[in-house]
Structure formats: C-alpha cells, structure tokens
Amino acid sequence: MNAELTKKYKYWQWRTLIVLMVAYILYYFLRKNFSAALPAMEAELGITKLQLGIFLTLNGIIYGFSRFINGFIADRCSRRLLLAGGLVLSSVINFTIAFSTKLDGVFNLLDVEGKATMGLVYLIGSLWVINGYIHGMGFPPCASLMAHWIKPSELATKQSIWNSSHSIGAGIVIALCGWLLTKFGM
C-alpha cells in the first residue's frame, strides 16, 4: 500500500472502532439501566424480587441464544443495519417500559394503591425478555466489523480498546440512572 492509501485506511479503521465503541456504550446503557432501576421498581410498583429475578434470568438466557443466532445473521446481512436496528428497537422497548405505568388508564395496569397488577408485571417482564434478544444484536456486528477493518496482527489490541466500551457504558448508566432516580423518582 502506498502512503496515501495507508493513511486513509488507518483513518477509517479508527473511525470504525470509535463508532463501534459508541454503539456498544449505548447497548450497555440500554441493557444496564434496568438493573439500576430495580430498587425503584420494587419500592414504587411493588414488583417482587422473585418476579424481577425471573425477568433477569430469562433475559440472560435469551441474550445468550441471541448472540449465537445473530452471529449467523451478521455474517449474511448488513452488519451496520443489524447494529443500528438493535439500538433503535431496544430504545423503543426501554421507553415503553419507562412509560408503561402511564398506560394504566387504557389497560388497568395499576391497582388502587398504585402498585403493579400482574398485567403490568407481565408487560414489563415480556418486554425485558424481548429486549434480551435485541441486545444480542450488538456484539456480532461489532466483532465482524472489527475483523473486517483491522489486520489480524492488530486485532487483539484494538478489541481491547473496544472492550473498554463495556465499562464506560456500565459506569455512565449507573451514575445517570442513580441521579435521575434521585431527582425525579420512578
């Protein structure tokens, strides 16, 4: 490769890596916010630890299967579309969960004390399990795009840099959700 082409390649390589990091920070933000909201959901809606545990367990199982399934999908379709589509779908589900108590007038999801009925519990749980599948749409495109753009001799180093997105996303969500719950409540 000539110097001009090498310079362009490095530029796009780093740009791709940064975009993938931002995308995975957002995936982590959308995945870990539920954990940060658990105490508030338990206190304000009366959802039990057992119910929350079932949601989280099923979410984790579905997430594991989803990463496997979406690995095959990422090899056969647009990785960028899969990555972005998962972020959009997960955002929609997160907003639906966040505003699910506002659907009370339509679906009678809260009892007279303002606690969750089983309908609301099933709605939140089902949405979170579906979100588990959608979260599995994040890693396969990232891994595939990194392998496509980064030389094998540099891949481990660049993946180590990309892996910091997990910690950054988790840190941001805990800090932000903690502040939001303190400031605005559920």
Where are these regions (language model features)?
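Extracytoplasmic
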Residues: R15-K49
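Residue-level signature of mid-helix packing/kink "hotspots" within the transmembrane helices
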Residues: K32, G60-F68, A170-G171
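Membrane-interface helix termini in secondary transporters
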Residues: A40, G71-F72, W179
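Helix-to-loop junctions at the C-terminal end of transmembrane segments
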Residues: R67-S78
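C-terminal ends and interior cores of transmembrane alpha-helices
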Residues: V88-T117
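Cytoplasmic helix-loop-helix junction between adjacent transmembrane helices
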Residues: L127-H166
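Helix-loop-helix hairpin linking two adjacent transmembrane segments in secondary transporters
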Residues: W162-M186
